[in-house]
């Protein structure tokens, strides 16, 4: 679910910044999800949105699905059992790893999505 995803992000980025900093970033990190990603970090969120859309096509509810995972020194690990839990955890894990690898540009936080994300 989205709360677990937030914790997974913080684990992946080793708490360098709060997960909430990603909630209104660019065109895809948050609630908008349209237009052209503003950078590679935003592209991570676009891929995550697409992953969630695929999960929904398989009858899952990614924003609400809880799963088992661990924050480890070498990275996050999914330990879920059901198909939806495994799928959603994999979406979140891939996105958290992607976000951890990309640079965060404060200029892309809380942008005017009506103008920039068409």
Curated annotation (Swiss-Prot):
Expressed by the venom gland. It is found in: Secreted. Its main location: secreted. SUPFAM superfamilies: Phospholipase A2, PLA2 (SSF48619). Keywords: Disulfide bond, Secreted. One of its GO terms (biological process) is arachidonate secretion. The keyword Disulfide bond applies. Disulfide bonds join 11-71, 27-117, 29-45, 44-98, 51-91, 60-84, 78-89. Gene3D superfamilies: Phospholipase A2 domain. InterPro entries: PLipase_A2, PLipase_A2_Asp_AS, PLipase_A2_dom, PLipase_A2_dom_sf, PLipase_A2_His_AS. One of its GO terms (cellular component) is extracellular region. GO terms for molecular function: calcium ion binding; calcium-dependent phospholipase A2 activity; phospholipid binding. Belongs to the phospholipase A2 family. Group I subfamily. D49 sub-subfamily. Heterotrimer: Snake venom phospholipase A2 (PLA2) heterotrimer that acts as a potent presynaptic neurotoxin by blocking synaptic transmission and synaptic vesicle recycling. May act by binding in a calcium-dependent fashion to neurotonal pentraxin-1 (NPTX1) and neurotonal pentraxin-2 (NPTX2), but not to neuronal pentraxin receptor (NPTXR). Also binds to taipoxin-associated calcium binding protein 49 (RCN2), a protein localized in the lumen of endoplasmic reticulum. Heterotrimer of alpha, beta, and gamma chains; non-covalently linked. This is Neutral phospholipase A2 homolog taipoxin beta chain 2.
């Amino acid at each position: 679910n989205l709360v677990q995803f937030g914790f997974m992000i913080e684990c992946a980025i080793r708490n360098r910044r709060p997960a909430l900093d990603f909630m209104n970033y660019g065109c895809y990190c948050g609630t908008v999800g349209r237009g052209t990603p503003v950078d590679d970090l935003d592209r991570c969120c676009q891929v995550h949105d697409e992953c969630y859309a695929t999960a929904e096509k398989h009858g899952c509810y990614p924003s609400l699905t809880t799963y088992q995972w661990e924050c480890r020194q070498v990275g996050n690990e999914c330990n879920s059992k059901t198909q939806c839990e495994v799928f959603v955890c994999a979406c979140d894990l891939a996105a958290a790893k992607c976000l951890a690898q990309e640079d965060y540009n404060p200029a892309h936080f809380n942008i005017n999505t009506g103008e920039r994300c068409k």
